C-alpha cells in the first residue's frame, strides 16, 4: 500500500496549480444532476422517482424511500451514489407490481424531495447512467485571475487526466488498507458491497499510477506504440497498432488512449504502453495477485476525460461558478484539481 497515502503526488497535466479555493462551503456549492441514456416508457411494474437530496447519504435515502413505499431495499434500483455534502438529483426505481403508486408529496424525510415520478418496465441498474451535470461554486479564491482563465480554457479545450477521485478510496484512504487485508484473508465473509469497494480501490489506485506516469511523459492525451483505445462516448475499447490514422483520431478527441483496470490474464497493451503499465504492476505484486485470484478480468479506462458543455462565470473576484458534464465514473473534483489547490469543506 502506498505510504504516505495522498493524491497530491499524481502528476498534473498543466502543472501543479498555485491558485487556491474552497469547495463545498455549503451543499448548494456542489450540485449534481444525473443523466440516463434512455427514455422512460410511462408504463410498467417499476415506478421511477426523480429524487433531490441535500446533505444526505444515497444509501440511507434509498432505504427511507423503500420503507415509505412498503418495499425492501432489494426492490429499489439506484444507478450510482452521489456526494453527501451537496444538492443532488438522481433517479431511483421502486418495484411496485400491481400496486398503486404512492403520492410522492407524502414522503417526509429530512433533506429529501421527490420531484417527479414515472413508470417504466425495467429496474434501474447499478451503473445505469450516462453521466452527470455538475454545477460548482468555488469560494475564497486566492490567485492570479488571468492564470485561472488560461487553465479554464485549457480544461475546456483539451480535457484533463481521468483520475479516480478521493471518494473512490474511502475516508482517509481506508479502502486501500481494507483491500490489503481482504487479499491477506484477514476479512472473513465480507459483505458483497464492501468487498467490491475494497477491490475497486486497489484497482483504481493502480490505474491512477499508470495515468500519472503517462502524464509525466506527456502522453496521457496522445497515442504511443502499443496503446489500447476507447471510443469517445463509449466503453468499448480495442487494440490496433497498425493503423496510422489512430493518432490523428486521438488528437481530434474521437479516441482516447486507455490504462489498465488490471485483473486476470495478459495486459492487452503492447510495446511502450505495455512497459508503462507493467512497471506499475510490478510495484504492486500483492494487489495484482489478489485481483487475479478473485478472477477479475482485464478492463480499460480512458486516460483522458473531456468536460462537455463547460461554462463558467465570475460571481465576484473571489467566487467562481463552473458547470460541465462528465461521463459516468469521472470525477468533478479531478477536473477542479487542474484549476486550484482545492480545500474541500466536507
From Swiss-Prot:
Sample GO molecular function, one term: tRNA pseudouridine(13) synthase activity
Catalytic activity: uridine(13) in tRNA = pseudouridine(13) in tRNA
Entry's EC annotation: 5.4.99.27
Gene Ontology biological process: tRNA pseudouridine synthesis
PROSITE patterns, per database record: TRUD
Class of enzymatic activity (EC top level): isomerase
Active site: 83 (nucleophile)
Any Pfam family: TruD
Tree of life domain: Bacteria
Alphabetical list of CDD domains matching this protein: PseudoU_synth_EcTruD
Coiled coil regions, renumbered to chain: none
Function comment: Responsible for synthesis of pseudouridine from uracil-13 in transfer RNAs.
Family: Belongs to the pseudouridine synthase TruD family.
HAMAP family: TruD
Name used for this protein in its record: tRNA pseudouridine synthase D
